[in-house]
From Swiss-Prot:
Compositional bias ranges of the Polar residues kind: 181-190, 252-264
Oligomer status and interactors: Interacts with DNA and microtubules. Microtubule bundling is inhibited by IPO7, KPNA2 and KPNB1 while association with DNA is also inhibited by IPO7 and KPNA2.
Encoding gene per record: Nusap1
Post-translational modification: Ubiquitinated. Ubiquitination by FZR1 may lead to proteasome-dependent degradation of this protein.
Low complexity biased stretches: 119-128
Identification of the protein by name: Nucleolar and spindle-associated protein 1
Length: 427
């Protein structure tokens, strides 16, 4: 790889300079001027030394500038401090002769350091003491009398610094006290006595014995009502209404229900399910005796067995009696169970006709059409010759006639298709 000279580098393009920097292992993502300088410095060691000297000179000039600016800031601060002290001394009827020297400033700085350390020790002692004692401490320096006439200029400056620091000390002490008190309160209120809380909750709750007693009482009250209902149902016989016959006595012909509704039918499921006997509600219709006959051996001692002696008359009538359930089953027969009736030709011919049959000649089916294509063509030509200057406009009546004819043709085609006449004609 040939190393290009400085003149050749100046003639290079930016892309060539970047490629060269990448080959040499330098950073290529820079501006053109900086990249050219970096390449020259890398290739020529003399230029590198010159760049180093330039950097050192720049650094020294920067340091001198920083030093000068810091001195100027210090002078401005010292001037500001003097003006403040002058104002304070005017208020206290004091005068300052001359500008403070560097020695006096150093003494003030040392005194301030001493006061800071003493203040820090006092703060530690106050923290160890009680908060009441610490609250009383900052009020002591306020009670001291000011010795303005006997104090010198240096002492006055120190006193001013101390006076300016007093409110800061008070604030810090007060904030520490309040923070300590707040922390103590929080820690004391965070842990409640759970034992007392649980005891109060358990006292409010009802005991198990009380709950059982209340439940038993409630059941007794309701069971007595149910027993009364059962007694009434067992002893009292229902009185049939005057205007109507009872349901089991009606013959099959008189009973013609148009539609059986569940509300009108008196259905009792308690016979089938004895466990629901105590849940009977007060119905509008009187309760019927259950047809379920119990055996004399199976009947319990407490229950009375009701039996009706069956006579011959009742046996005869029982055949004619049809209950609503039987009616329902007879009326609703499934199509799968019922067999399809076989067509009997003799029986159908013997029956009288329910319509009047047609007598006489029948009209021919489908009119015989002649080949009138030639005649139609001649008539059409003559018609156009007559009306070539005034063309014939289609009227509504003609349109209606055409539509009516189309409808008739459509109807005939449908009838032919239904009666399979089109197939026979084709054959």
């Amino acid at each position: 790889m040939t190393v290009p000279s400085a003149e050749e580098l100046d003639s290079f393009k930016y892309s060539d300079l970047q490629n060269l920097a990448k080959r040499l292992g330098l950073r290529a993502n820079m501006k053109a001027d900086k990249l050219l300088k970096a390449l020259k410095a890398h290739l020529n060691p003399e230029t590198r030394k010159e760049n180093k000297n330039q950097d050192e000179n720049q650094f020294s000039t920067d340091e001198t500038e920083i030093h000068v600016s810091s001195e100027e800031q210090a002078e401005t601060e010292s001037g500001g401090h003097v003006t403040k002290t002058r104002r304070r001394r005017r208020k206290k009827h004091k005068t300052i002769h001359g500008i403070p020297t560097s020695q006096t400033l150093l003494q003030d700085h040392l005194e301030m350091k001493g006061t800071d350390s003493s203040n820090f020790q006092n703060q530690e002692n106050q923290e160890n003491q009680d908060p009441r004692d610490t609250a009383e401490v900052p009020s002591l320096p306020e009670q001291r009398p000011e010795d303005g006439n006997a104090a010198s200029s240096g002492e006055g400056e120190v006193n001013d610094i101390k006076d300016s620091k007093k409110p800061l000390e008070k604030r810090s002490l007060c904030t520490d006290e309040f923070s300590k008190l707040g922390n103590n309160k929080r820690t004391s209120a965070t842990t409640p006595n759970f034992k007392k809380l649980h005891e109060a909750r358990f006292k409010k709750m009802e005991s198990i014995d009380e709950y059982i007693m209340r439940k038993k009482k409630h059941l007794k009250e309701h069971s007595s009502l149910n027993e009364l209902k059962l007694d009434k149902k067992g002893i009292v016989t229902p009185v049939p209404p005057r205007g109507r016959l009872s349901v089991p006595c009606t013959p099959a012909r008189q009973q013609c229900p148009q539609g059986h509704s569940a509300t009108k039918m008196n259905v009792r499921f308690s016979a089938a399910t004895k466990d629901n006997e105590h849940k009977c509600s007060l119905t509008k219709t009187p309760a019927r005796k259950s047809p379920h006959v119990t055996a004399p051996g199976s009947a319990s001692k407490g229950q009375a067995v009701f039996r009706t002696p069956k006579s011959k008359a009742t046996e005869r009538t029982s055949i004619a009696v049809i209950t609503p359930f039987k009616l329902m089953t007879e009326a609703t027969q499934t199509p799968s169970s019922s067999k399809k009736p076989v067509f009997d030709l003799k029986a159908s011919l013997s029956r009288p006709l329910n319509y009047k049959p047609h007598k006489g000649k029948l009209k021919p089916w489908g009119q015989a059409k002649e080949n009138n294509s030639l005649n139609e063509r001649v008539s059409r030509v003559t018609f156009h010759r007559k009306t070539y200057k005034q063309p014939h406009l289609q009227t509504r009546e003609e349109r209606w006639k055409r539509q009516e004819q189309e409808r008739k043709e459509k109807k005939e085609k449908l009838l032919e298709a239904r009666r399979n006449l089109g197939v026979t004609k084709a054959q």
